[in-house]
């Protein structure tokens, strides 16, 4: 094969100009190997190189510089062949590499079809940055396949330290009408920082983080990082068992945690020991992480996401997060993460106006912006955007073995007029305020999750009375596994914040929740939202002095654990944190050991005992979502601030739950019950082990055959002030 004149190698000026400014849809049509009428030509662009040689086995042929940092050579052979490039930059040793522009597209036609239809359930395998190895005639070529969806761009390039952030070096090709641009770059592997240089129709260059990046630089840096996982999971037994668990009939108590401030400075790897031990000791069945996807502003607590596929690098690597989740599974504890598909921040290096146009966000500002939060709203009606989000849900379940997604701000998605004044929202096609596209997205997401990952949970933070949030999609519901009971939370906290002397006038705030308790599959949440923004901590909401605050918290928690519904408690409340929570410092662990620390220790001990009793007494969890699991024994004793109800299990078991929410003890309080004989005391918040008043209570109470309040039996018991007792029926 004999080199020919460089004059035969020139690129047409129009194409060269587009390549020069990185707005060519097909750089592969000019770079790499191409057959000609009388042979073949190879071209390569190597910015700043002083020499480029074609390597054919043991032969090296100097390529001709033809301007614009392009080197070319013409050969007599018209048949395709494998080769390498030997590139020399000033002052550096030569580098031998495969040519990026000889590789076939890394996405197939089925991939692009599924993406355009919004049905690619493993989107992360084909978009973003995926490390790959190709077998060639001259040996293996290892590198990274880059692909990005940017349909409005006129050119896209991969930029990074490996090419001096120069968009002319690694221009990507467009895969037809799919809107996807792709390029395989040899010798690029894990640890490389990169972005996509987007050339917009308006003539601007926008350097963007990869929407599908699996890792990002530590904020405030904004680059994406190539990453590859070699983690070996140890939780196969847990994952197999998860698919068989019926959440409706099993105990579920969730410890909500912000990983960065639980204990300051802890990494995922350190939390895999410290946090796991702590949660296991308290007896929780699940832990819920506030958002762990990458986010630029720590003060958002993770709820303004910039990298939906990237675990935040604040606390370690993706594999270290996998290790943390694996450690929870080894202790029999499920892991839920907060997931934010409702909106995203306007940072110009992230998703916002990604290719110069409204792409991920809705183009109409009346639907595309959330003014309260200063964010953009996803365009749920666009198939590729739905695919991005649905696949993201599957990604966390598949790649990180999470057991559930708590979906944030669902109400803001469901209503077109959410937090909008007249004239700031557009009705749907039927003239209503329901966001039909968001409804369709949520139904699709839930149905897909349940089909692909049986046993995985989806939990809605939904603050309105939208019907059928947890009803199946085939029956017109949204299809969530569970819904936060915001009404219960608001009424309960409002009641317990009042002085006992005034509570009799607010008795219905506690009883009203049972009117609708079984209309959805509810979680009772006391979350981070209730201890921030000037609301104070639970401790500070309780009226009275230290003793009364501690007693109030113990009674509140007992009421929560007895009430129908699964449980969620935010970190710090289990020790009676006195100040409201801030992400800027760790929990005040010293409160347990400091002055009056016994009261805080008592609250922690009670939470441990509540979780234990909740698991052991089937009546407390088996019929959380059925009216057959609950009976009022005393709902109307407002004058004494007393509530009594019975929880029922499938096996006929019963748990009598007594709450005295006043400052006055009732030494001989009579209650009608359904079961005669003995009722055994299994929990007493007034006990000395919780630093209560330790009023002496018998281990059992007896129920006699005397009709009372519609029940065939009557029992008489001592109900101490500001306390709760659980009794189980023994017959």
Swiss-Prot record:
The active site is at residues 408, 461. This is 1,4-alpha-glucan branching enzyme GlgB. One of its GO terms (cellular component) is cytosol. GO terms for biological process: glycogen biosynthetic process. Belongs to the glycosyl hydrolase 13 family. GlgB subfamily. It comes from Corynebacterium efficiens (strain DSM 44549 / YS-314 / AJ 12310 / JCM 11189 / NBRC 100395). One of its GO terms (molecular function) is hydrolase activity, hydrolyzing O-glycosyl compounds. Keywords: Carbohydrate metabolism, Glycogen biosynthesis, Glycogen metabolism, Glycosyltransferase, Transferase. Pathway: Glycan biosynthesis; glycogen biosynthesis. Its EC number is 2.4.1.18. Monomer. It catalyses: Transfers a segment of a (1->4)-alpha-D-glucan chain to a primary hydroxy group in a similar glucan chain. It holds the Pfam family GlgB_N. Catalyzes the formation of the alpha-1,6-glucosidic linkages in glycogen by scission of a 1,4-alpha-linked oligosaccharide from growing alpha-1,4-glucan chains and the subsequent attachment of the oligosaccharide to the alpha-1,6 position. SUPFAM superfamilies: (Trans)glycosidases, E set domains, Glycosyl hydrolase domain. The keyword Transferase applies.
């Amino acid at each position: 094969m004999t080199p020919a004149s460089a004059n035969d190698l020139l690129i047409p000026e129009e194409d060269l100009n587009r390549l020069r400014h990185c707005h060519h849809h097909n750089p592969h049509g000019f770079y790499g190997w191409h057959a000609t009428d009388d042979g073949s030509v190879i071209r390569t662009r190597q910015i700043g190189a002083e020499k480029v040689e074609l390597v054919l086995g043991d032969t090296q042929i100097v390529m001709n510089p033809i301007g614009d940092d392009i080197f070319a050579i013409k050969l007599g052979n018209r048949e395709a062949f494998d080769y390498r490039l030997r590139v020399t930059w000033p002052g550096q040793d030569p580098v031998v590499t495969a040519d990026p522009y000889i590789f076939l597209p890394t996405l197939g036609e089925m991939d692009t079809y599924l993406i355009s239809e919004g049905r690619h359930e493993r989107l992360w395998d084909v978009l973003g940055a995926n490390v790959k190895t190709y077998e060639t005639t001259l040996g293996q070529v290892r590198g990274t396949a880059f692909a990005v969806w940017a349909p409005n761009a006129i050119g896209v390039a991969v930029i990074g330290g490996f090419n001096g952030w120069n968009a002319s070096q690694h221009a990507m090709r467009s895969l037809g009408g799919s809107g996807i641009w792709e390029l395989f770059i040899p010798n690029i592997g894990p640890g490389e920082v990169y972005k996509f240089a987007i050339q917009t129709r308006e003539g601007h260059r926008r350097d963007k983080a990869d929407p599908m990046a699996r890792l990002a630089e530590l904020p405030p840096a904004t680059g994406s990082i190539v990453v590859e996982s070699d983690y070996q999971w140890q939780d196969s037994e847990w994952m197999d068992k998860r698919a068989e668990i019926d959440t409706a009939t099993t105990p579920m108590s969730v410890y909500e945690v912000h990983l960065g401030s639980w204990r300051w400075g802890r990494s995922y790897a350190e939390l895999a020991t410290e946090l796991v031990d702590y949660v296991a000791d308290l007896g929780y069945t699940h832990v819920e992480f506030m958002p762990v996807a990458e986010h630029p502003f720590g003060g958002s607590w993770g709820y303004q996401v910039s990298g939906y596929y990237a675990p935040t690098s604040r606390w370690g690597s993706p594999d270290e997060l996998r290790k943390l989740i694996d450690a929870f599974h080894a202790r029999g504890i499920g892991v839920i993460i907060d997931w934010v598909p409702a909106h995203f921040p306007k940072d110009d290096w992230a998703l916002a106006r990604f290719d110069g146009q409204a792409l991920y966000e809705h183009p109409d500002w009346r639907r595309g912006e959330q003014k309260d939060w200063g964010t953009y709203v996803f365009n749920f009606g666009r198939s590729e955007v739905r695919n991005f989000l649905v696949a993201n849900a599957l990604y966390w379940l598949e790649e990180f073995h999470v057991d559930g997604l708590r979906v944030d701000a669902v109400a803001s998605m469901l209503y077109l007029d959410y937090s909008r004044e007249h004239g700031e929202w557009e009705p749907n096609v039927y003239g209503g305020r329901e966001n039909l596209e968001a409804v369709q997205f949520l139904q699709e997401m839930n149905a897909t999750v349940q089909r692909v990952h049986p046993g995985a949970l989806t939990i809605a933070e939904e603050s309105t009375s939208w019907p059928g949030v947890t009803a199946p999609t085939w029956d017109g519901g949204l299809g969530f596994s569970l819904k936060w009971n915001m009404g219960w939370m608001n009424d309960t906290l409002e009641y317990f914040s009042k002085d006992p002397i005034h509570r009799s006038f607010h008795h219905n705030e506690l009883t009203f929740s049972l009117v609708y308790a079984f209309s959805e599959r509810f979680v009772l949440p006391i979350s981070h939202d209730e201890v921030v923004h000037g609301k104070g901590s639970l401790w500070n909401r309780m009226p009275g002095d230290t003793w009364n605050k501690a007693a109030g918290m113990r009674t509140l928690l007992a009421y929560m654990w007895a009430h129908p519904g699964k449980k969620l408690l935010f970190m710090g409340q289990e020790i009676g944190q006195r100040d409201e929570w801030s992400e800027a410092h760790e929990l005040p662990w010293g409160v347990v050991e400091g002055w009056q620390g016994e009261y805080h220790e008592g609250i922690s001990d009670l939470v441990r005992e509540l979780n234990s009793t909740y698991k052991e007494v089937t009546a407390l969890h088996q019929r959380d979502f059925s009216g057959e699991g609950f009976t009022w024994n005393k709902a109307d004793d407002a004058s004494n601030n007393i509530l009594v109800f019975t929880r029922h299990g499938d096996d006929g078991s019963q748990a009598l739950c007594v709450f005295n929410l006043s400052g006055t003890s009732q030494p001989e309080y009579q209650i009608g019950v359904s079961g005669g004989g003995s009722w055994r005391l299994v929990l007493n918040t007034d006990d000395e082990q919780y630093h209560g008043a330790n009023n002496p209570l018998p281990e059992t109470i007896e129920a006699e055959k005397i009709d009372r309040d519609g029940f065939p039996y009557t029992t008489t018991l001592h109900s101490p002030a500001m306390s709760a007792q659980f009794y189980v029926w023994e017959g």
